[in-house]
């Protein structure tokens, strides 16, 4: 088994599956759906093999594959995973089959839907799903293929150990997501939201491209030019690149700008609420729980390890923006009347926690952030999909149109309650441990930032309990009598998510055992260590730290 290129298999299986599904005859819609399921489950099986064979205590990067790609520019086809990448690979491959099941009818004509399917017709089928003669075209094929293509590109972004290779797939995933939002979205503003998503992220990508080229120029000036991530990190640590510190700060900002848009970090978040609301629930989860994690992953791997000194310099500013995002997302969520928009703003708050944990540069903060990426993916998937199932039955996103749902759909209401409590980090559910670690790590470095972060916990309880009370409790509102409970297909989606939230809430040790060695390697690479616990704060000696921080905002 050691001779099998598992990482190449991992990303090529969904990509090949996407191509084959597009080539299926137009009328074979059911075959396209089932083929997508088979491909996604096969990809999950490969990821389980990778996770099972991964040894956290061994070398930092495992399953390494290295082949020449563009030798003239020092670019190679280099793959490998550390513990952080393994966790994100598992998150991606677990969610994709569930999202395909959840979106089983997302590309289906409205006349084919019925209450028994768990989705009520809300609007006529878009013209693009029909030919001029009324015969169905490849709408289902495209939907499944685009989802698998995004899975492939996200996986490649996580396992790439070449900066140029990472960049290519980091940008390429925007195209299938654009078509999923604009081509299959359910809102009237889906086209505008898709364009907004694409323009924001493309602009960030262009800035990052300049930084990628600049990084290569630096390596070529002081050494043999390369895009190999590990070689560049080793060169930075050894001081082989003697460029002006201002150059490295500019390169850091180029990478950070693209990742801040993708993640998203306040105030670069404005594309997210519209894109999430106008998409189908499954596409919104694919975007927020899977694709956007590449942004926070990029901060943890590329920003910190390629540019340790600039990361330390800009640390106070980034942590400040992250905490502002935490509070901003929570406050704006409280004022929403649209259920899906409210949930979308909660993700902005959660991403603020993740980014703060990364940039406080403590072991607890970074372990908590990595675990938070996993837990946020699961909790967001659960709450967004269950809300989507409810909206599909009622045909309205307005919170005011609901009430008494728990009396007509008790299972739906119960699972929504569990996922909502996971979103507010209730003890006993998965996000609690990760949020606790992030706050603990932040407090040891910036106690005031942690104190403001704690206020967001109170605000999150306010907006989620208010949402549950308005939607699920009280008398049954007019028009809600026909709302049915979760059907079998929907339970297949919800049950694993709820189970994982419960299991990881009481026993996160197996995941932390994979994450912690990778975090320790990152801390060693960037020359950081946890602050010594003390009450007093003596002035550090000159030269005591690796580099100075920038001015505290």
From Swiss-Prot:
<dbReference type="GO" id="GO:0015990">
    <property type="term" value="P:electron transport coupled proton transport"/>
</dbReference>
<comment type="function">
    <text>NDH-1 shuttles electrons from NADH, via FMN and iron-sulfur (Fe-S) centers, to quinones in the respiratory chain. The immediate electron acceptor for the enzyme in this species is believed to be menaquinone. Couples the redox reaction to proton translocation (for every two electrons transferred, four hydrogen ions are translocated across the cytoplasmic membrane), and thus conserves the redox energy in a proton gradient.</text>
</comment>
<dbReference type="InterPro" id="IPR010227">
    <property type="entry name" value="NADH_Q_OxRdtase_chainM/4"/>
</dbReference>
<keyword id="KW-1278">Translocase</keyword>
<protein>
    <recommendedName>
        <fullName>NADH-quinone oxidoreductase subunit M</fullName>
        <ecNumber>7.1.1.-</ecNumber>
    </recommendedName>
</protein>
<feature type="transmembrane region" description="Helical">
    <location>
        <begin position="164"/>
        <end position="184"/>
    </location>
</feature>
<feature type="transmembrane region" description="Helical">
    <location>
        <begin position="371"/>
        <end position="391"/>
    </location>
</feature>
<dbReference type="GO" id="GO:0009060">
    <property type="term" value="P:aerobic respiration"/>
</dbReference>
<feature type="transmembrane region" description="Helical">
    <location>
        <begin position="246"/>
        <end position="266"/>
    </location>
</feature>
<feature type="transmembrane region" description="Helical">
    <location>
        <begin position="140"/>
        <end position="160"/>
    </location>
</feature>
<dbReference type="GO" id="GO:0005886">
    <property type="term" value="C:plasma membrane"/>
</dbReference>
<keyword id="KW-1003">Cell membrane</keyword>
<feature type="transmembrane region" description="Helical">
    <location>
        <begin position="34"/>
        <end position="54"/>
    </location>
</feature>
<dbReference type="GO" id="GO:0045271">
    <property type="term" value="C:respiratory chain complex I"/>
</dbReference>
<dbReference type="GO" id="GO:0008137">
    <property type="term" value="F:NADH dehydrogenase (ubiquinone) activity"/>
</dbReference>
<feature type="transmembrane region" description="Helical">
    <location>
        <begin position="4"/>
        <end position="24"/>
    </location>
</feature>
<keyword id="KW-0874">Quinone</keyword>
<keyword id="KW-0472">Membrane</keyword>
<feature type="transmembrane region" description="Helical">
    <location>
        <begin position="420"/>
        <end position="440"/>
    </location>
</feature>
<feature type="transmembrane region" description="Helical">
    <location>
        <begin position="342"/>
        <end position="362"/>
    </location>
</feature>
<keyword id="KW-1133">Transmembrane helix</keyword>
<feature type="compositionally biased region" description="Low complexity">
    <location>
        <begin position="531"/>
        <end position="544"/>
    </location>
</feature>
<dbReference type="InterPro" id="IPR003918">
    <property type="entry name" value="NADH_UbQ_OxRdtase"/>
</dbReference>
<dbReference type="GO" id="GO:0048039">
    <property type="term" value="F:ubiquinone binding"/>
</dbReference>
<comment type="similarity">
    <text>Belongs to the complex I subunit 4 family.</text>
</comment>
<keyword id="KW-0520">NAD</keyword>
<feature type="transmembrane region" description="Helical">
    <location>
        <begin position="84"/>
        <end position="104"/>
    </location>
</feature>
<feature type="transmembrane region" description="Helical">
    <location>
        <begin position="197"/>
        <end position="217"/>
    </location>
</feature>
<dbReference type="Pfam" id="PF00361">
    <property type="entry name" value="Proton_antipo_M"/>
</dbReference>
<dbReference type="GO" id="GO:0042773">
    <property type="term" value="P:ATP synthesis coupled electron transport"/>
</dbReference>
<dbReference type="InterPro" id="IPR001750">
    <property type="entry name" value="ND/Mrp_TM"/>
</dbReference>
<feature type="transmembrane region" description="Helical">
    <location>
        <begin position="316"/>
        <end position="336"/>
    </location>
</feature>
<feature type="region of interest" description="Disordered">
    <location>
        <begin position="113"/>
        <end position="135"/>
    </location>
</feature>
<feature type="region of interest" description="Disordered">
    <location>
        <begin position="527"/>
        <end position="553"/>
    </location>
</feature>
<keyword id="KW-0812">Transmembrane</keyword>
<feature type="transmembrane region" description="Helical">
    <location>
        <begin position="492"/>
        <end position="512"/>
    </location>
</feature>
<feature type="transmembrane region" description="Helical">
    <location>
        <begin position="447"/>
        <end position="467"/>
    </location>
</feature>
């Amino acid at each position: 088994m050691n001779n099998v290129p598992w990482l190449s298999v991992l990303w090529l299986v969904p990509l090949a599956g996407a191509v084959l599904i597009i080539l299926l005859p137009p009328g074979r819609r059911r075959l396209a759906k089932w083929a997508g399921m088979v491909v996604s489950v096969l990809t999950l099986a490969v990821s389980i093999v990778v996770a099972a064979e991964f040894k956290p205590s061994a070398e930092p990067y495992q399953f390494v594959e290295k082949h020449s790609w563009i030798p003239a520019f020092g670019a190679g086809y280099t793959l490998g995973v550390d513990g952080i990448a393994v966790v994100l690979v598992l998150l991606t491959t677990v969610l994709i089959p569930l999202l395909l099941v959840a979106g089983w009818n997302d590309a289906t004509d409205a006349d084919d839907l019925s209450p028994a399917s768990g989705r009520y017709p809300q609007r006529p089928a878009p013209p693009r799903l029909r030919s001029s003669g009324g015969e169905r075209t490849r709408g289902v094929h495209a939907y499944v293929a685009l989802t698998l293509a995004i899975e492939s590109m996200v996986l490649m972004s996580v396992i790439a150990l070449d900066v140029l290779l990472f960049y290519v797939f980091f940008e390429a995933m925007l195209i299938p997501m654009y078509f999923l939002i604009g081509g299959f979205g359910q809102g009237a503003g889906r086209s505008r939201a898709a364009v907004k998503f694409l323009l924001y992220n493309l602009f960030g990508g262009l800035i990052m491209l300049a930084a990628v080229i600049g990084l290569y120029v630096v390596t070529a000036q002081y050494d043999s030019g390369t895009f190999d991530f590990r070689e560049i990190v080793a060169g930075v640590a050894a001081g082989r690149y003697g460029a002006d510190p201002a150059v490295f700060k500019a390169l850091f900002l180029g990478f950070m700008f693209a990742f801040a848009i993708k993640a998203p970090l306040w105030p670069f978040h404005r594309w997210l609420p519209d894109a999430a609301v106008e998409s189908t629930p499954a596409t919104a989860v694919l975007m927020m729980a899977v694709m956007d994690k590449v942004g926070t992953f990029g901060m943890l791997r590329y920003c910190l390890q390629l540019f340790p000194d600039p990361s330390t310099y800009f640390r106070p500013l980034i942590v400040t923006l992250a905490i502002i995002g935490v509070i901003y997302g929570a406050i704006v969520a409280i004022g929403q009347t649209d259920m899906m928009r409210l949930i979308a703003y909660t993700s902005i708050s959660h991403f603020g926690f993740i980014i703060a944990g990364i940039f406080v540069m403590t072991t607890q903060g970074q372990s908590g952030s990595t675990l938070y990426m996993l837990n946020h993916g699961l909790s967001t998937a659960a709450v967004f999909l269950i809300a989507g199932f409810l909206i599909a039955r009622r045909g309205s996103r307005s919170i005011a149109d609901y009430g008494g749902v728990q009396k007509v759909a008790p299972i739906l209401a119960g699972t929504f309650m569990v996922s909502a409590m996971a979103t507010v980090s209730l003890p006993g559910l998965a996000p609690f441990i990760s949020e606790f670690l992030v706050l603990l790590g932040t407090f040891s470095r910036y106690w005031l930032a942690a104190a403001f972060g704690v206020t967001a916990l109170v605000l999150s309880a306010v907006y989620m309990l208010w949402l549950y009370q308005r939607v699920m409790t009280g008398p049954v509102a007019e028009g809600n009598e026909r709302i049915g409970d979760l059907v079998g297909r929907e339970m297949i989606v919800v049950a694993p998510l709820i189970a994982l939230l419960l299991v990881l809430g009481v026993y996160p040790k197996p995941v932390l055992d994979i994450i912690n060695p990778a975090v320790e390697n990152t801390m060693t690479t960037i020359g950081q260590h946890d602050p010594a616990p003390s009450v007093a704060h003596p002035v550090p000696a000159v030269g005591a730290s690796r580099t100075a921080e920038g001015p505290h905002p």
